[in-house]
Curated annotation (Swiss-Prot):
It comes from the Bacteria. Pathway: Purine metabolism; IMP biosynthesis via de novo pathway; 5-amino-1-(5-phospho-D-ribosyl)imidazole-4-carboxamide from 5-amino-1-(5-phospho-D-ribosyl)imidazole-4-carboxylate: step 1/2. GO terms for biological process: 'de novo' IMP biosynthetic process; cobalamin biosynthetic process. Pfam families: SAICAR_synt (PF01259). It catalyses: 5-amino-1-(5-phospho-D-ribosyl)imidazole-4-carboxylate + L-aspartate + ATP = (2S)-2-[5-amino-1-(5-phospho-beta-D-ribosyl)imidazole-4-carboxamido]succinate + ADP + phosphate + 2 H(+). This is Phosphoribosylaminoimidazole-succinocarboxamide synthase. Its EC number is 6.3.2.6. Belongs to the SAICAR synthetase family. HAMAP family: SAICAR_synth (MF_00137). Keywords: ATP-binding, Ligase, Nucleotide-binding, Purine biosynthesis. GO terms for molecular function: ATP binding; phosphoribosylaminoimidazolesuccinocarboxamide synthase activity. SUPFAM superfamilies: SAICAR synthase-like (SSF56104).
Length: 245
């Protein structure tokens, strides 16, 4: 495979075209951003760690029947993926109250929700990625009613799988963000990444509200030891996969 030109550069990854029209190369960066890129920094080794975690989780999800854009990982910080047209929605699944849910509703941090909450946010930096109702996103024609139904179903399936997987890692899956895209056959595929950048992860055996954090909240909230937390998550993922296999 030969790499051609840069197609897109986001906050965490650069996408390149290749000599295969339906295959892209995703290069994971060490750059870190928070609060819609108002806070910027760098986490040493983040690109390699997030790519490795995402690669493992995509393969586990594929084995469970969830279709993803993942093909393979030719280098520690690179992933070959199927070219998809990204649906401009950030799909957030919440199992425990935290972050904006607690801030906007008054639900106490750490409250276990009676059932998973699926939310849709408009993927638009200029507007600040606003929370959308189902009717609004249909009005904006960001997706069809059938696609919204399928995405919701997939999101809950993925949540069921990941909750169990992270539990086997000694990690509690508080909430996480997913992105989906359409391939050339208009099939919905799970895209983007699954990593400490996109998941809120708490160490199951740690009660202290700061020490338990194993995700990008360590960067957002200046808790320190960000690299160590990311590396610990990767090690637990690799161990869980080895045991499972």
């Amino acid at each position: 495979m030969s790499v051609h030109s840069k197609l897109y550069e986001g906050k965490a990854k650069i996408l390149y075209t290749t000599d295969e029209p339906e295959v892209l190369l995703a290069d994971f960066k060490d750059d870190a951003t928070a609060f819609n890129a108002q806070k910027r920094g760098s986490i040493i080794g983040k690109g390699r760690i997030n790519c490795s975690i995402s690669s493992q989780l995509f393969q586990q999800l594929e084995a469970s029947g969830i279709k993803t854009h993942f093909i393979d990982s030719p280098a520690p910080n690179q992933m070959r993926v199927k070219a998809v047209k990204i649906i401009p929605l950030e799909v957030v699944i919440r199992n425990i109250a935290a972050g904006s849910l607690s801030q906007q509703t008054g639900i106490e941090l750490g409250t276990v929700l009676k059932q998973p909450l699926v939310e849709f946010y408009y993927k638009n930096d200029q507007l600040g990625d606003p929370l959308l109702t189902r009717d609004r996103l249909l009005l904006m024609e960001l997706a069809t009613a059938e696609q919204v139904e399928e995405i919701t179903h997939l999101a809950l399936q993925i949540n069921d799988f990941l909750k169990n997987f992270w539990q086997n890692c000694g990690i509690t899956l508080v909430d996480f963000k997913l992105e989906f895209g359409l391939d050339s056959q208009q099939q919905i595929l799970l895209a983007d990444e699954i990593s400490p950048d996109t998941c809120r992860l708490w160490n199951t055996t740690e009660a202290d509200p700061n020490r338990r954090v194993m995700d990008k909240d360590r960067f957002r909230r200046d808790l320190g030891n960000v690299e160590d937390a990311y590396q610990e998550v990767l090690q637990r993922v690799l161990t869980a996969v080895e045991i499972k296999n």
